[in-house]
Design a protein with these regions (language model features):
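Short acidic loop-to-beta-strand element that houses the catalytic metal-binding Asp/Glu
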Residues: 66, 171-175
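Short beta-strand element of the conserved SAM-dependent methyltransferase core
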Residues: 70, 102, 127-131, 174, ...
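Peripheral (often C-terminal) accessory segments that flank ATP-dependent C-N-forming ligase machineries
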Residues: 204-303
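ATP-dependent carboxylate/phosphate-activation module, predominantly the ATP-grasp catalytic core
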Residues: 107-110, 115-164, 176-223
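Active-site-adjacent "lid" and substrate-binding segments of diverse enzymatic cores
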Residues: 166-169
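Active-site nucleotide/adenylate-binding loops and adjacent lid/helix of ATP-dependent enzymes
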Residues: 27-158, 297
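ATP-binding N-terminal substructure of ATP-dependent carboxylate-amine bond-forming enzymes
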Residues: 1-50, 212, 261-272, 280-303
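An exposure/low-complexity boundary signal
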Residues: 2-19, 182-195, 242-270
Length: 303
């Protein structure tokens, strides 16, 4: 499949989309890392800090001030694995971990941004904000219809300085308009909320290094997340019941976000919980209601 999707619950967004031979579109950081040797340095979070002039260092080097934010230097699995706030020098002495780094604890709005890029120049932006819970979890994400001009200006300039020669989708994670992570792929969790024809335009971008998406029918959407407890072996819910829910116009898609044939510990999940499902929708209250219903279905179907 030329659109490389490793999570089977997201292939629904790419089925039936024609992709020319020889064109490979990553939706996964590991695949993107292999595809783009010239630009894969962006997965080194030390360099993300360095290119922005942010104080940073390896574990073993003492920060000049606390608190700091600690995380793995490389993490191609995502989900905030291994990340934490370190409050003091005393705590730092106990928390040092090989392969980890620290950076400033940045405060502000947390935004996930997808940009369509042609030769290092952004041609299209879409921003998503998350309602955070604890320990790396999010309650839901709002896919915004409106722009974020300051993020677009800051990240656009960063792209021009650092990703000349790259054409494709870039995903930024920012807090307070500072880049905390960057990925050479799209946010495949909510591409159905970007509008009809968007995936086809992405294929055209990778095939022709050109962007032509009209984007004249934007609407705000929501990606609502269901978490369960760690260490539980969950079964899948009745697919026929899920199909009935998908017939509702306010619901765009539902993802069951785990491998039933894998042990819970074999999944990359945030410290706070095990992600079971995602409801993408056009109406937040409807999405929250479906999440509650799914939760009841999961508790009723233990493995």
């Amino acid at each position: 499949m030329p659109i490389v999707e490793r999570d089977p619950w997201r292939t629904q967004y790419f089925e039936g989309v024609a992709c020319p031979d020889g064109v490979t579109i990553p939706t996964d950081d590991a695949e993107a890392y292999l595809l783009y040797p010239t630009h894969r340095w962006i997965y080194n979070k030390l360099l993300i800090c360095e290119t922005q002039g942010l104080e940073h260092g390896l574990h073993g080097l003492m920060p000049s001030r606390f608190p700091v934010f600690s995380k793995p230097i490389f993490n191609l699995k995502g989900m905030g694995a291994g990340s934490k706030v370190i409050e003091s020098p005393k705590a730092y002495e106990h928390e040092q971990t090989p392969g980890h780094m620290w950076m400033p604890l940045i405060v502000g709005e947390h935004v996930s941004t997808d940009a369509a890029v042609v030769d290092g120049e952004a041609k299209w932006w879409r921003h998503t904000i998350g309602k955070a819970l604890s320990d790396g979890m999010f309650d839901y994400w709002t896919v915004l219809a409106e722009p974020r001009p300051q993020i677009e200006a800051y990240c656009g300039e960063w792209l021009r300085r650092n990703l000349k020669g790259y054409s494709g989708i870039v995903n930024f994670e920012t807090i307070g308009e500072t880049i905390i992570e960057c990925h050479l792929r799209m946010s495949d969790q909510w591409v159905d909320l970007y509008g009809p024809g968007w995936v086809e335009s992405v294929v055209h971008l990778y095939a022709n290094k050109d962007w032509g998406y009209a984007d004249d029918s934007r609407r705000t959407g929501y990606s609502v997340v269901l978490f369960g407890k760690h260490g539980v072996r969950y079964g899948q819910v009745d697919r026929s019941m899920v199909a009935e829910v998908l017939s509702r116009p306010e619901i765009s898609s539902i993802q069951m976000t785990f491998h039933e044939d894998k042990l819970p510990d074999a999944h990359s999940m945030p410290p706070g919980g095990f992600r079971l499902a995602i409801v993408n929708c056009w109406d937040l209250e409807a999405g929250l209601a479906i999440r509650e219903w799914l939760g009841l279905m999961f508790w009723a179907t233990p493995k």
